[in-house]
Curated annotation (Swiss-Prot):
Gene that this sequence comes from: Y3IP1
Protein name from the UniProt record: Ycf3-interacting protein 1, chloroplastic
Transmembrane spans: 255-275
Additional observations: Plants silencing Y3IP1 can grow autotrophically on soil, but show a light-green phenotype, very slow growth and delayed development. Plants over-expressing Y3IP1 show enhanced resistance to salt, drought and heat stresses, and treatment with paraquat.
Protein family according to the UniProt entry: Belongs to the Y3IP1/CEST family.
Quaternary structure (record): Interacts with Ycf3.
Role summary: Nuclear genome-encoded factor that participates in photosystem I (PSI) biogenesis. Cooperates with the plastid genome-encoded protein PSI assembly Ycf3 in the assembly of stable PSI units in the thylakoid membrane. Involved in light-induced chloroplast development and growth. Involved in the plant response to abiotic and photooxidative stresses. May be involved in the suppression of photooxidative damage.
Originating species: Arabidopsis thaliana (Mouse-ear cress)
Residue interval of the organelle targeting sequence: 1-62
Cellular-component GO terms for this entry: chloroplast; chloroplast thylakoid membrane; thylakoid
Compositional bias segments (type: Acidic residues): 91-103
Keywords: Chaperone, Chloroplast, Membrane, Plastid, Stress response, Thylakoid, Transit peptide, Transmembrane, Transmembrane helix
Length: 280
């Protein structure tokens, strides 16, 4: 173990044991050379260990070279990296303990919740954020029923607790609160029409695209908008009769031209009215 010698410029209080076994207290006004030993080593055959409940501070052993040996423990703040490392180690230890005590019933709940999330994604095209937002919304009918029945339980998990547990399940973790996990499981399996697959409507042109020749190829636009090729191929031309198509185009362009020319018509009308009044 390496040691370093420093000079203390300020007064410091030292406690030491004399040869008679009595402890002496005194203040030294002159700087004395001291040896500082880090707490992670061995000093004079004694192991120096930091207390487990004090994670934010280490300790130094300060020994005076001259005279009787003095031992002072000086708290030293840990760096941010050391604090983060200790926190990570503590979390890893807790995870190992939790993984060793997994309840089969909790594991069953987690698997069923994952299955419901997968069904919602496949049948309803719902992403995880939408499922989480739905869980966070409180049903007003349930609130009214509890109010009428006088059910007020402070220990009942809140909607935020359910959303947090759902996020843990989605991350592959098992929530520690069994009551919250059980309530979340009941909410998920009671999702209405879970097994029914909703028919997806085929994409078509908008009303503006139907009435106006935009000159845009849907497949080319889909490429630029990063839309899947299958979805772009599903956008097909609508079968419209030629006569109906001509009438629709004329009506579409006529309305557009009329709206554009309306300010000009108003301006000309105002000028003519003023000119007519000036002649009188």
């Amino acid at each position: 173990m390496t040691t370093q010698i420093f000079q203390l410029p300020l007064k410091y209080c030292a406690s030491s044991f004399s040869s008679t076994g009595q402890r002496n207290y005194g203040a030294s006004s002159s700087p004395s050379p001291i040896v500082i030993c880090k707490s992670n080593g061995i000093s004079d055959g004694l192991w120096v260990k930091r207390r487990k409940n004090n994670r934010r501070f280490g300790s130094l052993i300060v020994k005076q070279e001259k005279g009787d040996v003095t031992e002072i423990r000086v708290p030293v703040p840990l760096t941010l990296e050391q604090q983060e490392k200790e926190k990570q180690n503590r979390d890893d230890e807790e995870d190992e303990i939790d993984e060793g005590d997994v309840d089969p019933e909790d594991l069953k709940y987690v698997n069923e919740i994952k299955r419901v999330i997968e069904l919602l994604r496949r049948n309803r095209d719902m992403i995880f954020s939408e499922v989480k937002l739905t869980i966070m919304i409180e049903d007003p009918r349930e609130l009214e029923r509890r109010r009428l029945l006088g059910i007020e339980d402070a220990d009942t998990p809140s909607r935020d607790d359910l959303a947090e547990a759902l996020e843990q399940v989605n991350d592959g973790k098992i929530p520690k609160d069994r009551a919250t996990l059980r309530m979340l499981h009941e909410e998920m399996i009671r999702w209405p029409n879970l097994e029914v697959e909703v028919s997806k409507k085929q994409r078509g042109k908008s009303m503006y695209a139907k009435s106006t020749d935009t000159g845009i190829d849907p497949k080319e636009a889909a490429k630029r908008l990063n839309v899947e090729w299958d979805s772009a191929a599903a956008i097909e031309e609508v079968d419209v009769d030629d006569e109906q198509g001509v009438v629709t185009k004329v009506a579409g362009y006529g309305a557009l031209y009329f709206v554009s020319a309306l300010p000009v018509i108003i301006g000309i009308s105002v000028v003519l009215i003023l000119f007519y009044n000036s002649l009188q």
